[in-house]
């Protein structure tokens, strides 16, 4: 249902901050011959944590402490969802996209959780750590929460403990709603969520302010949600390397959706090193279909000659990842996301003067011009490609002239929809954007330009490289 999707999807936006975080960082130095147009991203000290405790916090935790009262949620949405996580108690029968927590006043509420963002179905199975790629943010959902307000009032009234437990979530969702509209399904409007919440929070004690302190541009810039299993290699968060310092602190800002003040932020922050430790333990899923091993071996040679200086090496024991930021003229991909944090500095100025930037484990937001060349572990599972999800298959990524300007897929994420030849999603080429399920790569922010490095390869080398990428 639209309401269910929107509630869970807002957490998808909020917790995308986790998509590039990790508990420890590699101390790999850039190798000699680092490509021109790149900058090495230095590591930062990180806190350790208990991975198992982190997983329990992930599937039961109250980092979002306000939501729909449990009886209302069950009445409207039911409680017979598949048992994807094996949870017990109140969470049994609730979608993996939500947690059931006890609000500060004792009311049980259903809240969105990290897995709204960082879990997705692939071939019929929920893969924890795979970025969501099916969500639809193309309609303005602020009115949905106005309707939810009426439902909670009808059940309990505005003077009830249930309304008190629900209202902080409703208030935040309605503030965010106008800023998270996208023009195509499947992409994520994460660039605006934290900026909007920050505009409604005092920097020092983080309490809510009804009126915005600074203006936030209305237009959302699309992103593709990265996979969690890449995190263990990263030195910086976000596609443009914006997030520096303590990743647990940076990631704990997801609590800004509903937290009361900095005291609650501190409680959440104390638990996030455990969650980071669990995220760091994840491994990429293996390609589940046959691989031509001889062809893949030839592709490894192509990869290490043409790709490894930016994306790393994957042949143990020589595995390494260089942590490079590639400047815009070099990579050539759509520049809008990178430019966004430079064209309106109010958000990172707020953050760098806020509670989150204080103490021994502070975070910082340092805008860069360019994009991080990501690790490629499990790349077969992470279609569509580029930072904005504009390219449906790896074959299209490696041969830019064949990238479709308009393309459409089913969003079923079943085996029947997976293209084992081109490695990615089966799609139809369209002549225009007739509906939200059609990706329009002609729009600013959505363009499929750049990363043309595969164009110079022969057809035989591209085929071999494609086979090798299945093995990562």
Give the location of each predicted region.
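C-terminal motif of bacterial Sec signal peptides marking the signal peptidase cleavage site
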Residues: 17-20
């Amino acid at each position: 249902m639209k309401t269910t999707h929107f509630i869970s999807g807002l957490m998808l936006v909020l917790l995308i901050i986790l998509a590039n975080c990790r508990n420890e960082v590699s101390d790999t130095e850039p190798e000699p011959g680092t490509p021109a147009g790149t900058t090495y991203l230095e590591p930062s000290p990180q806190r350790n944590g208990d991975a198992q405790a982190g997983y329990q916090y992930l599937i039961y935790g109250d980092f979002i402490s306000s939501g729909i009262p449990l009886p209302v949620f069950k009445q409207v949405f039911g409680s017979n969802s598949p048992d994807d996580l094996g949870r017990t108690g109140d969470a049994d029968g609730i979608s993996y996209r939500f947690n059931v927590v006890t609000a500060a006043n004792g009311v049980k509420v259903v809240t969105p959780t990290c897995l709204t963002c960082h879990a997705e179905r692939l071939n019929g199975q929920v893969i924890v750590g795979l970025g969501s790629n099916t969500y639809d943010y193309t309609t303005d959902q602020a009115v949905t929460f106005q309707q939810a307000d009426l439902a909670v009032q009808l059940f309990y009234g505005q003077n009830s403990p249930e309304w008190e437990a629900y209202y902080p979530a409703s208030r935040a969702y309605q503030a965010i709603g106008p800023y998270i509209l996208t023009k195509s399904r499947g992409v994520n409007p994460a660039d605006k969520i934290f900026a909007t919440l920050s505009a409604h929070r005092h920097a020092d004690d983080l309490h809510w302010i009804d009126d915005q302190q600074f203006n936030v541009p209305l237009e959302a810039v699309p992103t593709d949600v990265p996979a969690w299993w890449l995190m263990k290699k990263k030195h910086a968060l976000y596609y443009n390397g914006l997030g520096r310092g303590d990743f647990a602190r940076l990631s704990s800002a997801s609590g800004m959706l509903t937290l009361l003040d900095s005291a609650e932020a501190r409680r959440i922050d104390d638990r996030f090193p455990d969650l980071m430790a669990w995220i760091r333990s994840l491994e990429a899923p293996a390609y589940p279909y046959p691989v031509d091993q001889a062809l893949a071996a030839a592709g490894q040679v192509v990869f290490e000659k043409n790709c490894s200086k930016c994306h790393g090496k994957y042949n143990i024991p020589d595995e390494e990842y260089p942590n490079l930021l590639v400047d815009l003229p070099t990579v050539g991909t759509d520049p809008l996301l990178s430019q966004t944090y430079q064209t309106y500095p109010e958000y990172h100025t707020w953050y760098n003067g806020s509670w989150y930037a204080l103490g021994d484990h502070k975070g910082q937001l340092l805008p860069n011009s360019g994009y991080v060349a990501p690790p490629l572990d499990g790349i077969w599972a992470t279609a569509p490609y580029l930072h904005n999800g504009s390219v449906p298959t790896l074959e299209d990524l490696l041969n830019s002239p064949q990238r479709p300007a308009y393309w459409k897929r089913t969003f079923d994420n079943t085996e029947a929809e997976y293209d084992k030849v081109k490695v990615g999603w089966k799609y139809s080429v369209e002549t225009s954007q007739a509906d939200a399920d059609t990706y329009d790569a002609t729009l600013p922010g959505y363009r499929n330009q750049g990363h043309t490095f595969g164009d110079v390869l022969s057809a035989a080398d591209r085929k071999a490289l494609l086979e090798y990428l299945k093995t990562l």
